[in-house]
Every structure is written in structure tokens, then in C-alpha cells.
């Protein structure tokens, strides 16, 4: 009689056979196992693992089915940023891209790796010692969301690498997508079941991967292609991009079979034509092709510009287009007051999506196209994502149409719509008095990346603003549980009579009588159900609501108490979050982070003249002027004062960056003022002769010319200084420069930090400060704060609920610091919270 196989051996054999089948199906595209046989093996493995739970493993194929839902995704900071790519839309742009590389590297015909640009969701997969440990979305490039549980359900993604020789840490970047045939089959199944269909494969992939319940993701037909690597440690990879892709394929990752190595611009353009011709017949959606310099040494030599590499570019296909009719042109007011014209369209299918609205960008664009109500227009999904009106079919224009004009008044608040000189965008002048701007400002202020007020949704923000209880974002910190309960009852009631019936159950008789008087005051006939104005809710909310003493025993209050607690929690924040939350035009997360790192103090930032902001890398004139305009407004300064007075606390204030010592000078101020003809060279020349704007005026034209400054430059400078507002700005900028320099630590204190050259890792939750704040303070002392533990880690800071990083640090003999030791160390070196 044959002995039964050992369960551990059988489980191991089943896992290997199933993963081999996955590899042959998804990577090699050479399926060698029938679906029925695959299902039979999977069922046997599931049964064995249930019978022997001690043999369970995270990398088992059975773990792809998904787990219970999470409440939200955790943030993941990418060790290396997931950069975006520059775009090319013409052959000339591609030729120019190749020319720049050829000249820089002195190579006539450089080699490129060319590949399709999949229309899916970019992700990063982290492997340690060959095992999948974490997966994250791209997010903003610096920080993504942990979607590891969902990625485990994607069969094309290996849970353990094949072969050998992988680095200890390997981060693989790629695209999760939904194949066209799988998308159509899924939608057909949903229609048959009466379920919700997906709009298009791209949205299907992105939405599936961001499901909080991984069991839902497991039911979606997702796949994956690898296109590169991120962090790599303790291991070597080939020195060309194409060879790296070949190595990834050998380790078990699917790589597009359409990847080719081509030479020069002719090779790139020929590849573009081949892929474009085959586009409609591909098994997946693409919106262009990507060209990457194949040689890694050349990539390092080319480097990066802003948030994109100089050695790679995306060559986009022309957007898909359809014709339809303009039914109306309306104005939308954004949170910064921008008045954007939007075309309301007769519904039309464009690139798999029903489009009913399309942006017209601005009034100048409407004038160029001469778009009119009633016109037949060409609608294009720019980048296959954002619908826009691309052209007017003039010969189909009906008679009697009229040229469109920008309205003179805001459609929301009635304030004047104005346009600054030289600007394309019109804006509502109502600023914070405009409900449209207030609502958008509140949405932005409480968002996750800003003040992170959990539980305050868009609909309730509208109720808050409409009620008049909050007129500025600082009013959030005055709200009470009773006010929230009152607003919820009004906003959800079907009629004022229903609201009063509900209120009677929860109010003392005197308070109820007061409420009844308010309802009658807005014109509601309480004797019957008639004569109820459609706007009764908004009217009552605006009527100045009394504060009622609700009977907490009879009404559900937990949601309101949780919201108040979330508002209270948001009082403690960081400078970069606070700056981002203000909603300053052109100031995104990266700019807010840079401002925080360079200046370190809200009081300093809010009083700086705009030219000094240009000293921060990647902040140009437009962003600097936007910052200056924002802080010049008395209403905005009052809003900041209100927030601080109502308990908002910025916990990571620190001295300005020592880099400002070299960046700031009289010459730099001259350069940044945007004075006509005063180039950086002329600014240095002027600063060598005088040391202040007052001295410039005193010196006069002759003295400046004798110092070698050309007469046209001197004339332009003195003419600029003749305007009082320019003189005031110049003097303020120089005074602010001196203030900043005076606040810098002494030069001899900046030579080295106590942690220079040391790598530190933080894990767990800290009580006294956030991990971001701890990271900034450690970096200020010279440390490099990493995301993973290795033999090179100097010490690990372990907070509450420290996880696997603590275990790994202990196994490697890495020194462990508790929060108390960290705080003492920071205090000893001037970085106390």
C-alpha cells in the first residue's frame, strides 16, 4: 500500500506547480495547463492549507483571493520618487529629444529602449530576499498608498521571485491594467447580473486596485507589465534598461513583448508608426509609446529636470475624437476663484466614455475657436482622459447664433468677474465671500493631504457653508456637537413638517417653540403641507439658527462626536500641511514642502515679499507672485490669525535652511525682482558697485555707467525705481533678506551635524511628534532617514506598535532607540519638538 505524501511536501509541490502555471500563462504567454486542471490543483491546495493552518504562507497562490476590507489605505513613501515623464506630440519634439541626448553624451545615434505606454495604473512592488512584501500606487510621486493586499490578488504579479541572484531589496515599477477582452467579459457578466459596469479598462484597473475590500479586487480581471526598477540594494543589475527588463522577465515578471531596442530618432519614429498601426488590435489599451535611453550610465549623465528624467519621454498618440452639439456654455467657479467656461454637450461616446461636459479652458480659447451655443464641435479626450472642445465644425453652424461673451458677474455670488493684466484666467472677485470658493476652500482644507479632517464629506461641507455657521475655514474649530446634529436633521429632512416632528422628540418645549417660530418665519404654513418654499432648508439654515439643547439619550450622536474629535485632532499639524491647506494658487504639496524646508517658520513665510520665494529651487516667478498676492490680502492674513487663535498648532517650526546663506544676497534680490534688462550677470555687476537700493538711487546713472553697467540697463533700472510701489517692494525685499540671514545659525555651527553620514529608520507611532516631524529633525542633524532596515542602519527609532522593522533590526544587531531617547537627543541638539 502506497504511503500518503507528507502534507508539507504536497503543499510545497502544489504551490510550485500553480505558480509555474501562472508564470507560463502571464509571463511566457505559453499556457500548458487546462483551466479545469488548474482549478483542481487550487482546490486541493486550499483544502490542505485549511487542514494544516500551521503550514500557511503569505506567498501561497491561495492568498490571492483577497482579505477583509480595510478602513483606509496607509501611506507609503517611495524610497526613490516615481517620476512622471515629459510628453512629445510631434516628430519634431522627438527629434529634439534625441538631439539633446546626442549632444550631451557626444553619441551620434544613441540606443533607446522603446515600449508601449499602457493606459492603466502605475505601481511599485517591493521584494525583500525574493519575497513580495509591499505594493504601492504612484500617488504624487513621493508618497503613494499601500495596496499590497489588492496586488496579491493579481495573478500576473509573482509573490516569490523565480531563479536566483536577486538583490536583497528589489523595487519593481510597472503598470496594472485590465485587458480589453477581460474588460468586455466582465461588463457582460455585470449586465447579465444587473450589476454596475465599468466605464473603460483604465478606470476599471484604477478603481479595482483602490478597493478597500481586496475580495472585490480579486474578482476583477487585472494583469500587470513591468517596465523598470526603483530602489535596489545589496545586489547588482545589468547596465542597460533592456537587459534589466530581460532579467525581470527571468525572475518571473511579465514584460511586454513589444519592447524593442532602436537607434536614433529614425528608429524611434518607425517604432511609433508600427505600434500606432497595431494599436487597435492589441490586447490592452495604450495611449502612446515611451522612449528610454538604454544605457544606464547615459541616464545618470543626463539626469533630471524638475519631476521628470531628461533621458526618457512619452510620445503620445493623437487623442480620440467625436463630434457633438453644444447645448450651453456655463461658468464654473473653482476654489481659487478661477472662472472656467464649460460646454454642456449632447451626450457622446469618446474613447469608451459618455461625455456630457467638456472644458473650454478660458475665454481666450473660446474666442480662438469661436465656440457658440448650437455649434457642432469636435470633442477630444486630451491624453485620453480629460474631455475638451478641440474645434468647431463651422459649416454646420445653425443661423442666428451669437458669439459668446464672458459674464460680468459671478453666477454663484454676483460679484464682479475680473481678469488681471497679462493673465488668461478670469476670476470671481468675491474671494472668501463667494460660496463656491468657500466650499472648494473647505474641501481642500479638510482633505487628507491637507489638515486631514476625517469624516467631513463634500455634502456636509455644502450644508455647513449654506448654513452660515462657517464663513471661513477657522470657523471649523468653533463647531459643537449640537450644531452638527441640528444641521444633519435639517439637511436630511424631506419637509419642514417632518423636521419639526423629529425635533419635537429631542427638544425641550421652550426650545421647540423657538424652532417653530423660526420655521414660520421663513414662510412655511404649519397648518398643512402646502405653501412650502423649495428652498426651505437653505432658508432655515441661513436664518440664524438658535442653539438647542438636544436630548442626547434619544438621538444618535456618535457620528457628530467623532467629527468634532477629528476636527480637534487636526489642530496639530505640520508647516507643509498647513501651507498646502491654505489653497494658495500654484502651491501644491511639493512647493509647500520646499517652503517649509527652506524657511521653516510660518511667521517668516507669511511676511516675506514675493521675490525672496524665488530663492527656493523650482519656485519661479508665477508661483512666487501667487504667494505674494495671497499673503498681501488682509483677509487671508486674518484667516491665518483666526486659525492660530483657535488652536491650530504647527509642531515642526525650525530655523531657516543654512542653504539660504549662499542663496541670499543683494545680487540675488536684484535678480529676482524681475527688473527689465537686469539679468543675473548685470545683477552681479550692480551688486559689486553698491550694496542697497538706496545706494543705487544715490549713485546715479553716471556712476553706475562708470562701473561698467551699460546705459540701457541703468536707464531701465532707474525708471523702474521711479515707481513708488517698486521702491517699496525693493526695500522690503532687502530688509526681509537681512532678517532671514540674521536668523540663520552661525556658520561655524553648520560645518557638521552629529548624525552626518548615518542612516536612521523610524517605525511605529510616536506620541510627542509625527514621524514626518521626527524625520525632518533628524535630517536637520545630518541623518539620512531610510524606509528599510539594513546592516548599514545606525539605529532604529521604535515607537508604539513597531512591527517587522524592529524584528529585523534586532536580528541584525542594530541599535534600538525608544521615543524618550530620541526626544532627549533632539533636545540636546536644539531640535526639541
UniProtKB/Swiss-Prot annotation:
Organism whose genome encodes this protein: Xanthomonas euvesicatoria pv. vesicatoria (strain 85-10) (Xanthomonas campestris pv. vesicatoria)
Protein name: DNA ligase
NCBIfam families xref list: dnlj, PRK07956.1
SUPFAM superfamilies in alphabetical order: BRCT domain, DNA ligase/mRNA capping enzyme, catalytic domain, Nucleic acid-binding proteins, RuvA domain 2-like
EC number(s) per entry: 6.5.1.2
UniProt-annotated binding residues for Zn(2+): 410, 413, 428, 434
Any one cellular-component term (Gene Ontology): cytosol
Pfam family, any one: HHH_2
One example GO MF annotation: metal ion binding
HAMAP family hit by this protein: DNA_ligase_A
Cofactor(s) in the UniProt record: Mg(2+); Mn(2+)
Amino-acid positions noted as binding NAD(+) in the UniProt annotation, renumbered to this chain: 35-39, 84-85, 115, 138, 175, 292, 316
Record flagged with keyword Ribonucleoprotein: no
Amino acid at each position: 500500500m502506497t504511503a500518503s505524501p507528507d502534507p508539507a511536501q504536497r503543499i510545497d509541490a502544489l504551490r510550485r506547480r500553480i505558480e509555474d502555471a501562472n508564470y507560463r500563462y502571464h509571463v511566457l504567454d505559453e499556457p500548458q495547463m487546462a483551466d479545469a486542471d488548474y482549478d483542481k490543483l487550487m482546490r486541493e491546495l486550499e483544502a490542505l492549507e485549511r487542514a494544516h493552518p500551521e503550514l500557511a504562507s503569505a506567498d501561497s497562490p491561495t492568498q490571492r483571493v483577497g482579505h477583509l476590507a480595510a478602513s483606509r489605505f496607509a501611506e507609503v513613501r517611495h524610497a526613490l520618487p516615481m517620476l512622471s515623464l515629459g510628453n512629445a506630440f510631434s516628430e519634431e519634439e522627438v527629434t529634439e529629444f534625441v538631439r539633446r541626448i546626442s549632444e550631451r553624451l557626444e553619441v551620434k545615434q544613441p540606443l533607446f529602449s522603446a515600449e508601449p505606454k499602457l493606459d492603466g495604473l502605475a505601481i511599485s512592488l517591493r521584494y525583500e530576499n525574493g519575497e513580495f512584501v509591499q505594493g504601492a500606487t504612484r500617488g504624487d510621486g513621493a508618497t503613494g498608498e499601500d495596496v499590497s493586499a489588492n496586488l496579491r490578488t493579481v495573478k500576473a504579479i509573482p509573490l516569490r521571485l523565480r531563479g536566483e541572484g536577486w538583490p536583497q531589496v528589489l523595487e519593481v515599477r510597472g503598470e496594472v491594467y485590465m485587458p480589453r477582452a477581460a474588460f468586455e467579459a466582465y461588463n457582460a457578466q455585470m449586465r447579465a447580473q444587473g450589476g454596475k459596469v465599468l466605464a473603460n479598462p483604465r478606470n476599471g484597473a484604477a478603481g479595482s486596485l483602490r478597493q478597500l475590500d481586496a475580495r472585490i479586487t480579486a474578482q476583477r480581471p487585472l494583469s500587470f507589465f513591468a517596465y523598470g526598477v526603483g530602489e535596489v540594494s545589496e545586489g547588482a543589475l545589468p547596465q542597460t534598461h533592456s537587459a534589466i527588463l530581460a532579467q525581470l522577465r527571468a525572475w518571473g515578471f511579465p514584460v511586454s513583448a513589444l519592447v524593442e531596442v532602436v537607434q536614433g530618432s529614425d528608429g524611434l519614429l518607425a517604432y511609433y508608426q508600427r505600434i500606432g498601426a497595431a494599436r487597435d488590435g492589441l490586447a490592452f489599451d495604450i495611449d502612446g509609446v515611451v522612449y528610454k535611453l538604454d544605457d544606464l550610465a547615459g541616464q545618470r549623465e543626463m539626469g533630471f529636470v524638475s519631476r521628470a528624467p531628461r533621458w526618457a519621454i512619452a510620445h503620445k498618440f493623437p487623442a480620440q475624437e467625436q463630434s457633438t452639439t453644444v447645448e450651453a456654455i456655463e461658468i464654473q467657479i473653482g476654489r481659487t476663484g478661477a472662472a472656467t467656461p464649460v460646454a454642456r454637450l449632447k451626450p457622446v461616446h469618446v474613447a469608451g466614455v459618455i461625455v456630457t461636459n467638456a472644458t473650454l479652458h478660458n475665454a481666450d480659447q473660446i474666442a480662438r475657436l469661436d465656440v457658440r451655443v448650437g455649434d457642432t464641435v469636435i470633442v477630444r479626450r486630451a491624453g485620453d482622459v480629460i474631455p475638451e472642445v478641440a474645434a468647431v465644425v463651422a459649416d454646420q453652424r445653425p443661423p442666428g447664433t451669437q458669439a459668446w461673451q464672458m459674464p460680468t458677474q459671478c453666477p454663484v455670488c454676483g460679484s464682479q468677474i475680473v481678469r488681471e493684466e497679462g493673465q488668461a484666467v478670469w476670476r470671481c472677485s468675491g474671494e472668501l465671500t463667494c460660496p463656491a470658493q468657500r466650499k472648494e476652500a473647505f474641501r481642500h482644507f479638510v482633505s487628507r493631504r491637507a489638515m486631514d479632517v476625517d469624516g467631513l464629506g463634500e455634502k456636509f461641507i455644502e450644508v455647513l457653508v449654506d448654513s452660515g455657521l462657517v464663513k471661513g475655514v477657522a470657523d471649523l474649530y468653533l463647531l459643537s456637537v449640537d450644531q452638527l446634529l441640528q444641521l444633519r436633521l435639517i439637511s436630511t429632512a424631506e419637509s419642514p413638517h417632518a423636521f419639526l416632528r423629529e425635533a419635537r422628540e429631542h427638544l425641550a418645549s421652550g426650545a421647540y417653540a423657538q424652532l417653530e417660530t423660526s420655521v414660520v418665519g421663513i414662510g412655511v404654513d404649519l397648518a398643512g403641507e402646502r405653501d412650502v418654499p423649495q428652498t426651505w432648508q437653505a432658508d432655515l439654515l441661513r436664518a440664524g439658527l438658535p442653539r438647542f439643547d438636544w436630548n442626547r439619550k434619544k438621538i444618535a450622536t456618535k457620528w457628530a462626536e467623532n467629527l468634532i474629535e477629528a476636527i480637534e485632532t487636526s489642530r496639530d499639524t505640520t508647516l507643509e500641511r498647513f501651507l498646502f491647506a491654505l489653497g494658495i494658487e500654484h502651491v501644491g504639496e511639493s512647493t509647500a514642502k520646499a517652503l517649509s524646508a527652506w524657511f521653516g517658520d510660518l511667521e517668516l513665510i507669511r511676511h516675506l515679499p514675493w521675490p525672496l520665494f524665488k530663492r527656493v529651487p523650482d519656485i519661479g516667478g508665477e508661483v512666487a507672485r501667487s504667494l505674494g498676492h495671497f499673503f498681501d490680502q488682509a483677509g487671508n492674513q486674518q484667516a491665518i490669525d483666526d486659525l492660530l487663535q483657535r488652536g491650530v498648532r504647527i509642531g515642526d517650526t525650525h530655523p531657516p535652511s543654512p542653504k539660504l546663506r549662499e542663496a541670499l544676497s543683494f545680487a540675488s534680490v536684484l535678480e529676482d525682482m524681475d527688473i527689465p534688462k537686469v539679468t543675473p550677470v548685470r545683477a552681479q555687476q550692480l551688486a559689486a558697485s553698491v550694496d542697497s537700493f538706496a545706494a543705487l538711487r544715490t549713485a546715479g546713472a553716471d556712476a553706475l555707467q562708470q562701473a561698467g553697467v551699460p546705459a540701457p540697463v541703468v536707464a531701465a533700472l532707474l525708471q523702474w525705481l521711479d515707481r513708488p510701489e517698486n521702491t517699496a517692494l525693493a526695500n522690503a525685499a532687502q530688509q526681509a533678506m537681512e532678517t532671514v540671514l540674521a536668523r540663520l545659525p552661525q556658520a561655524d555651527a553648520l560645518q557638521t551635524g552629529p548624525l552626518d553620514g548615518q542612516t536612521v529608520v523610524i517605525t511605529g507611532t510616536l506620541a510627542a511628534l509625527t514621524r514626518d516631524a521626527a524625520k525632518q529633525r533628524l535630517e536637520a542633524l545630518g541623518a539620512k532617514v531610510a524606509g528599510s532596515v539594513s546592516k548599514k542602519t545606525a539605529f532604529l527609532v521604535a515607537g508604539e506598535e513597531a512591527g517587522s522593522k524592529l524584528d529585523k533590526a534586532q536580528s541584525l544587531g542594530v541599535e534600538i532607540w525608544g521615543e524618550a531617547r530620541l526626544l532627549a537627543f533632539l533636545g540636546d541638539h536644539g531640535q526639541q519638538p
